[in-house]
Amino acid sequence: MKRVFLWLIFVLAFHKLLAEKIGDIASVVGVRDNQLIGYGLVIGLNGTGDKSGSKFTMQSISNMLESVNVKISADDIKSKNVAAVMITASLPPFARQGDKIDIHISSIGDAKSIQGGTLVMTPLNAVDGNIYALAQGAITSGNSNNLLSANIINGATIEREVSYDLFHKNAMTLSLKNPNFKNAIQVQNTLNKVFGNKVAIALDPKTIQITRPERFSMVEFLALVQEIPINYSAKNKIIVDEKSGTIVSGVDIIVHPIVVTSQDITLKITKEPLNDSKNTQDLDNNMSLDTAHNTLSSNGKNITIAGVVKALQKIGVSAKGMVSILQALKKSGAISAEMEIL
């Protein structure tokens, strides 16, 4: 039987052992990237550009030539050396005029390849319609698997800044990346302990309002806040990718004793010691597996998802079969952790 490999990735999910910095689990509201987009032309393609049937490309070429005082009808242009593209980029917070940002280019016509071409100067707009950057540059051979998209490192220059006065603010808001009542209160109490009462107040499971002490500027205060360690409570969760067979799980997630059957495989999960020593294999964490009867024992201790997966691997269950068994365990109530199926 062909062996099917299942990649099992264990991430720490201990509620008491996760020590994080506040800056790792929370962001500052208002301090974020802004998305930019633009429409432009890639020139210099060796016959791999859009065909003459792409009317918007031919019209764009005509408009570009007219901007340099060359007038020609779009119907008279037969070039295959030009491709119409969309350019996207992220404008980071506090970026200044003259700073460079990376851009991503994607063909929108019927070009065969945009590799080796040159992006003509293209304005990049934000959702407010204003131009914030100008993009231009040569497209070097990058991803050979996709000839219709490319990245240009430092391919755009920032022309307009997003105004944000952080220095004179007295209060800001922190937003937890993963909403949790316990974590919100933990951040509140930790900040009040470090800086004094009433510096922080949790408004909901995601939001903590902070007020800077008078002895700090807001920049100094946020710099200190982000470096403060905190005991972070992570939610027990299992993520299953049915297509690839990948399982991401916390190592301490408990599986209660049960008998589960999926397709032609039956697995008994128990805390009772095994009697059949002849067919018993010792697994990690004091777990034993009776391969003759497909019985997994934790020898009186809690059974974890890690042990269950290792047992299934030992008895030759396929990746698809493992996913089915885990789903069955969740539906039966043997696993209380949240499960997300991709």
UniProtKB/Swiss-Prot annotation:
GO molecular function: structural molecule activity
Keywords, comma-separated and alphabetical: Bacterial flagellum, Periplasm, Signal
Complex and partners: The basal body constitutes a major portion of the flagellar organelle and consists of four rings (L,P,S, and M) mounted on a central rod.
Phylogenetic placement of the source organism: Bacteria, Pseudomonadati, Campylobacterota, Epsilonproteobacteria, Campylobacterales
Record GO cellular component, one term: bacterial-type flagellum basal body, distal rod, P ring
Subcellular location: Periplasm; Bacterial flagellum basal body
Task of the protein: Assembles around the rod to form the L-ring and probably protects the motor/basal body from shearing forces during rotation.
Protein's name in the database: Flagellar P-ring protein
Originating species: Helicobacter pylori (strain G27)
Family: Belongs to the FlgI family.
Signal peptide region: 1-19
Pfam families in the record: FlgI
GO BP annotations, alphabetical order: bacterial-type flagellum-dependent cell motility
Gene that produces this protein: flgI
Disulfide bonds: none
